[in-house]
Amino acid sequence: NVDLFGVSIFSILGEATEVYEDNKLIYFKSNTFQNNKEKFVNLKFDKKSKKFIINGSSFSGEASTDCVIGNWWNHKILQANKQVSPLSGSVKDQIVTFIKKEDLLINGKKYSTDHFKLKSKDDTLPDDKKLDFDIWYNKENNLILKVSYTRMGSWEYRLKNFK
């Protein structure tokens, strides 16, 4: 919950399960409540068609297996041309651009990162549906360490620790 003067202006609660076989996604399920609105995704890999079958709150249909789940902690999102929304199942084309190398300081430790910009390929999408994220990736640990974006305020996600 995000509260402003005692009033909830944003809330999100969700749960998701991803299953991989031989490093390939075969199943994804999520249920999310965002601002009291239920969102969901049920994705399964169909062996016959070799495609993902998606039943989501904003999209139902097929998607190619070159899509990745739009999860900020999956570095494969930086190599993909399409992502599946982990909240609603919508499929969006994306463009990932390298910005520059940067050092990040997280919890007193310095990390070398590659800074990327991830944007929607389709500029005609409404602003609230567009992808527009800054992502910092650490090659040494093969991890996304930070993601930031501006939508209903400025948001920043940082990885606190890892094993």
Each model region followed by its residue ranges:
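Hydrophobic, well-structured mid-protein blocks that either form specific transmembrane helices
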Residues: S30-W72
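Acidic, serine/threonine-rich low-complexity disordered tracts
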Residues: N1-K47, I77-K163
